[in-house]
């Protein structure tokens, strides 16, 4: 690729999003960018893993071995991660939290494959934040009475004195923005750093930055995935109240 999909081995410093090709849609010019290509690659990796895992579990043995061990370990760890913050409501959120965890994690660590991480594009992280925001307030309106919601919006003052209402409204609206910006900024900073290193070191960079890839892509990527999911579960649990 000429621009931006592959970061490693580049002679020029390039961490921008580029158009790969364009087409006309009802008279409007639409670009397919490096982000779209990288998202497609990430999705194909996840779908491929899911197909193999599904076939493996269809032939599952009572005593797990081989790839079945890997699949069961992943599921158990994801379920355990959801259990603590979500409590008795955890089974309802296994699929959602597990899905966004895997999608974000694979996107974050795709830099190990030389790709530009899709989560380094705010157009990817913002929908994830909005989706969580909608799920938070769906649970809030489902499990809390209007009176409880109003009291929460007026907190810490009594409900008949809504001085804090504007500030609490802003804090609610800021949830998807803060979630998405935190993930986007951390992943983008790692992408920029690696692009600068490759651009400045040139040929030497083919082997030396491997340790930095482990930090920026693997360690930092896993941490940001965990933080996003934990904040999501905390917000949802708070919205559900004692349900």
Task: Describe the function of each predicted region.
Residues 1-243:
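Selective transmembrane helix interface/packing segments
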């Amino acid at each position: 690729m000429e621009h931006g999909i592959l970061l490693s081995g580049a002679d020029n410093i390039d961490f921008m999003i580029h158009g790969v090709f364009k087409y006309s849609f009802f008279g409007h010019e639409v670009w397919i960018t490096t982000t779209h290509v990288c998202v497609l690659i990430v999705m194909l990796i996840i779908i491929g893993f899911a197909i193999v895992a599904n076939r493996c579990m269809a032939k599952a043995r009572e005593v797990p071995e081989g790839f079945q061990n890997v699949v069961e370990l992943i599921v158990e760890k994801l379920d355990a991660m959801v259990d603590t913050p979500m409590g008795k409501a955890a089974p309802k959120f296994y699929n959602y939290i597990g899905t966004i965890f895997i999608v974000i994690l694979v996107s974050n660590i795709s830099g190990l494959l030389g790709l530009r991480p899709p989560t380094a594009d705010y157009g990817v992280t913002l929908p994830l934040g909005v989706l969580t925001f909608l799920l938070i307030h769906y649970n809030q309106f489902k499990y809390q009475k209007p009176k409880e919601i109003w009291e929460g919006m007026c907190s810490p003052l009594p409900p008949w004195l809504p001085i804090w209402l504007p500030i609490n409204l802003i804090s609610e609206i800021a949830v998807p923005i803060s979630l998405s910006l935190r993930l986007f900024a951390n992943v983008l900073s790692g992408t920029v750093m690696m692009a600068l290193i490759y651009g400045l070191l040139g040929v030497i960079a083919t082997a030396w930055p491997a340790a930095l890839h482990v930090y920026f892509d693997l360690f930092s990527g896993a941490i940001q995935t965990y933080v996003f999911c934990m904040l999501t579960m905390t917000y949802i649990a708070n919205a559900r109240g004692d349900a």
